[in-house]
Amino acid sequence: MKRLFWALAAALMMFAPAALAQTAQEITDTCTLSAVGKKTLGRMTDGQYQTYWASSSGSYAYVEIEAEESVGGLYVQFYEDIAALEVQTTDDAGAWQTVAVSGGSFLNEYIALDAGAETVRIRPKDGKGRLFIAELHIFGEGDAPDWVQQWEAPLDKADLLALAAHPDDELLFLGGTIPYYAGEMGRKVQVAYLVPTMPYRRLELLDGLWLCGVKNYPMIGHFPDKYQLTLKGMYAQKGWSRESVYRFVAETYRACRPDVVVTQDVNGEYGHGAHRAVADAAQAAIALAADEKYQEKMTHSEPWQVKKLYLHLYEQNPVKMDWRKPLAAFGGQTAFDLASRAFECHISQQRTDYHVEDFGPYDNSKFGLAYSSVGEDVQKDDFFENLE
């Protein structure tokens, strides 16, 4: 009997933390913020990614938070210039001491505080540099809510790479690819873009990817946002040489080592040159990434062989995906539903005429197998056919 008692007691102790865990409540509205540049402090809490607070430099680059209850976590959304942060509280003598440090790798960073305090400040690590913060969310004690993004590093071994020219192209033209494979099927999905566009659009894309079940931070290229109708015209643009685009995509293949790549239309969907370029480079980079001799300015020198490449609207070896199936991982919502909701996260793009559509001329459920080292598809309804 004693043995049974202690076994039950041990089990209760094991599960007690999980049972007692609670979701932290946001307390931002009840906090007082202070900093140099206080006239624009409200921009950090206005819910708008297109506005931001910029600090002074050096010792004045900080935000001080005065809360009415213990602060259990901070969610910082940088506008640009990601900074490693120190979170500080005061000791008994009133001196600032560092209690947590962020990694400084992602635009959105959540910093949990083990020892809650009502007076907290954040500053660049070692007190150097400036801060550019779009939004700051302050939480009481408890676990961060699910909507708070806690990113992991980009994958070094992906199952699938969703490769897009611009933020939102991965939803408009790749449809339910990301929510279906990342969220429902539990595949390791890496997302990459050629064009970073405006800083606020990068925050929008992160919201959309998180909603779709992506946990690994996207890879974002450096190509300027240009518009041309032809592939030749695109490659003639400054910063868009054919060689540099090929190199970036080949480097991406080697970095995340995907088995499957899904990308855009060789005709650029509605004719966009950057869309044409990403489809062109996706094909050319397969051989480059696998070539041991191709080392031109490459950080990742180990060759990688992509097994399958799917292009949007590609007419050869066509594949028709069903994005309308209910997904258990999302409570019965479909991949189409999730892609549509994720596109709504791109608030700055809602004034355009673009919509997530699995019908019409840009049907995002239609793809073609442009390359395969594992044979042609037979079922034609799964990007991982012949890879299981």
Q: Which residues does each predicted region cover?
A:
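Bacterial N-terminal signal peptides
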Residues: 7-16
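Disordered, acidic Ser/Thr/Pro-rich linker "stalks" and the adjacent N-terminal cap
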Residues: 19-70, 79-85, 89-91, 147-150
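The feature marks non-catalytic terminal segments
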Residues: 24, 28-43, 49, 151-152, ...
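Active-site rim/loop-helix segments in enzyme catalytic domains that contact anionic ligands
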Residues: 81, 109-111, 115-255, 283-287, ...
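Extracellular carbohydrate recognition and processing domains
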Residues: 97-113
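Proline-aspartate-enriched helix->loop->beta-strand connector
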Residues: 249-269
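Short Gly/Thr/Asp-enriched flexible loops that form oxyanion-binding sites at enzyme active sites
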Residues: 270-286
